[in-house]
Amino acid sequence: MQKKILVAVDGSPPSRQAVDYAGRMNNLIQGLTVTLFHIQPPISQFLLDEAKRSGRAQAELNKIAARNAEASRGLLAGYRETLIRAGLAEQSVEPATRPHNQGLAKDILDYAQNGLFDAILVGRRGISAVQQMFMGSVSAHLIENSPVIPVWLVDGNVRSTRVMAAVDGSESALRAVDHMAFMLSGNPEVRFCFFHVTPRLKDYCEINFGAEAGGGLETLIAQGDQRCMDDFFPAALAKLREAGFREEQIETRTDTTLLSVGETILEAAREGGFGAIVMGRRGMNKSFFGGKVSYSVSHKLSDAALWLVP
């Protein structure tokens, strides 16, 4: 079965890292096809308006558009060669370019949805102190606004092909497992790790309730979480079995932490040598807590990929 990934690129180092990651995924994903997608630079609104009134301005506009398209095709040709050298068949790598229309993220999402892609892969920009709130706006907008298609966010050089699914018992986490099972189906060698962090009271509320009240609430949270995961794990394992995976390919880990849930997930991924973290974008009942965890992981990700499933 074909698995279609849209790799959104420009000429930046993060885009080159995203392309390299797509090449490595060819060894993990059976039936992988990649479309390299580049949005051309926007053209001045002044020139667009002038072109409606002046033939000379229209001629200049046509020249700029032609140069943009030519530069885009050259960029994509180089990335295509990278993927072919990585082992993808020529017919499995398609370049595509479009003029800038509504905005980078919106244009990428529209193309991905119209093309029925299984995932959008993008490199994450480095985050400076000033950029912290924006997280490299294109990747941030893709993550927040993709209604259906999972977004794969790559940071740095990802060498490992090991996959860890960070799960919290939510429907979003089950959709993430379903996505992971589909993308990796047909590979008898792949190994998964289900990783669950038992949440603490502080993960839901920063108010200090005192030792007695806080202890009772901690117990209630732990008991509720255990009941939830007792239902979740059989459902998740069933999805993997339906996709053809054997039980010996699957490992399950549960951890408690004094850190935040997001930091614990990242630490477990680093210590376990996992190259990809798979998780749902929202937690139980689309809670802020679940969204806060995925937000934290996406911001602090380093030399790894995050498969974030709506």
Regions found by a protein language model. Name each.
Residues 102, 119-141, 160, 270, ...:
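Glycine-rich, Arg-bearing micro-motifs that act as flexible, cationic patches
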